[in-house]
Amino acid sequence: MVPHLTTALTGPINELEQRILESMPATERWFRLEWMEHTPPFYTSADLRNAGFKLAPVDTHLFPSTFNNLTPEMLPLAVQAAMAAIEKICPEAKNLLLIPDARTRNSFYLQSVQRLVEVFTQAGLNVRLGSLDESLTTPLPLPLPDGGELLLEPLVRSRGRLGLKDFDPCTVLLNNDLAAGVPRVLEHLHEQYLLPPLHAGWPVRRKNRHFQSYEEVAKKFAKLLGMDPWLINPIHGHCGQVDFADAAGLECVKAQADAVLAKVRRKYKEYGINEKPFVVVKADNATGMGVMALRDVKELDDPERVARGARGLLRGGATPSEVLIQEGVPSCERINDAVAEPVVVMIDRYVVGGFYRVHADRGTDLDLSLPGSTYVPLAFAGGSQLPRPGARPGASAPNRFYMYGVIGRLAMLAAAYELEATDPEAETYD
């Protein structure tokens, strides 16, 4: 089930939302059957875009760092989900080693880590933090905005196990996307559970592969509801050898962008949508970066436009050689007249909350994950009513967060498919 949270949606329920609300029993059963066959990622967050005529994920994060954006009222849901996840993986667990990323000076990130520590502590675990920084030899206090502190400690590796001094955990939880590579200290941990697995990190993971999996999931789900999968699936393309410094190196991007735009134009014509389609170009194996938005491939003939767009894709001083070309989904949602996009947060197979990412200086077709963005937590709606299939729209106080919970879980299920396909230790059968 999905918690009943407030959203920025105030207008009438559209056809897509109504269909999802009315299909709730079939949807929940379908998810139950899928989770019998597939293992959900340990935790996930999904960035969604709601165009009114279409609702789709545009990014799925397997090392979410946004738990600080959940309201305190969401904590019991997160704790219950964490307990369920731990009981499946290591029911006898008493110690959890949490390994954060290097953003130890980012107060918002530290608040997210603090929230994770709180969740797993209340789930019945002793939680301590370990650092991948080999130069750290003594415990390092990390001050928090509320006056508290986190203690980051040096890791201790012994054969097939990883821990801290006088601390031997059953499970090691990564909150680090490994964009800088896989440290040797994390390899060959055969005696412990490492979650998420190493192949969930960016050295292996590709957004293109994820959205291929999502397309498969969306087609299955759309067939269940008797609707066009395009309504919940962003069309995408991929380029594996891109050189932003060379015009010849952009030919693939031009071809893929042209193909995606042509497909979207046909869909817009089919549904009578009077908007100009666009695509976004983003790094295929990284997150937390900008994107390049294109409405016409001729924009790539302008060297200044290309250079400006390439700078937006920078990470670690280098532009990506692999890119995803994704159908742009405009956002119809506003908070205080600023463009907003919902983010759904999940632990195990459960939706534990959500929030809006808001940017007052960005348009409906632009990426909101940039400096200047703010975050608006979603609170519980008044009352605890469930969606009532068949009720007249507006008469049953429907859970308008429900459709976000559905699409978020579809993205999580796609991540499960993706991780199964890339598991280096998966058994194969001829």
State where each predicted segment sits.
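Glycine-rich phosphate-binding loop of ATP-grasp-fold ATP-dependent ligases
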Residues: 237-252, 278-305
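Conserved metal-phosphate-binding beta-hairpin within the catalytic cores
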Residues: 38-67, 282, 328, 340-349, ...
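Short glycine- and acidic-rich boundary segments immediately preceding or forming the N-terminal edge
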Residues: 1-38, 220-230
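Short, flexible loop/turn elements at secondary-structure junctions
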Residues: 47-52, 62-64, 102, 154-156, ...
